[in-house]
Amino acid sequence: MVKAVAVIRGDSKVSGTVTFEQANENTPTTISWNITGHDANAERGFHVHQFGDNTNGCTSAGPHFNPFGKTHGAPEDDERHVGDLGNFKTDAEGNAVGSKQDKLVKLIGAESVLGRTLVVHAGTDDLGRGGNEESKKTGNAGPRPACGVIGIAA
């Protein structure tokens, strides 16, 4: 079992943790999140981005992690970036707790997300269905108020 964590923080009140667990290279990865300080009663996009570089804040993380050269999509779509995790829902206080399994996100192997950045966005991910060019790149999820590098967890 490989475990990883991203400690989320940035130039906003958004903070928290996103954890990853994968039993072996052929099993889905369980992704769990506990994020606070976001907009109340909202859906907000989150993605694994290409680089683990946060020297210029979350903008240094680059585009979505996309080793297979696909366009942006929903986590359940065949046509999607590896880093496309969709949206999480916040409660009346702006907090979000949840988990999901993902068959493309890996901690083991050549396409591992270890050392890359998990970015929490300011807007809702349109899952590549926005009808414009940016939708197929970013899901129109907006600015990057918080992020964290995905590192090996104890």
Curated annotation (Swiss-Prot):
Family: Belongs to the Cu-Zn superoxide dismutase family.
Role noted for this protein: Destroys radicals which are normally produced within the cells and which are toxic to biological systems.
Organism: Aspergillus niger (strain ATCC MYA-4892 / CBS 513.88 / FGSC A1513)
Gene that encodes the chain: sodC
Classification via CDD domains: Cu-Zn_Superoxide_Dismutase
Matches recorded under InterPro entries: SOD-like_Cu/Zn_dom_sf (IPR036423), SOD_Cu/Zn_/chaperone (IPR024134), SOD_Cu/Zn_BS (IPR018152), SOD_Cu_Zn_dom (IPR001424)
Binding site for Zn(2+): 64, 72, 81, 84
Enzyme class: oxidoreductase
Binding site for substrate: 144
Amino-acid positions noted as binding Cu cation in the UniProt annotation, renumbered to this chain: 47, 49, 64, 121
Broad class of the protein's primary localization: cytoplasm
Protein name: Superoxide dismutase [Cu-Zn]
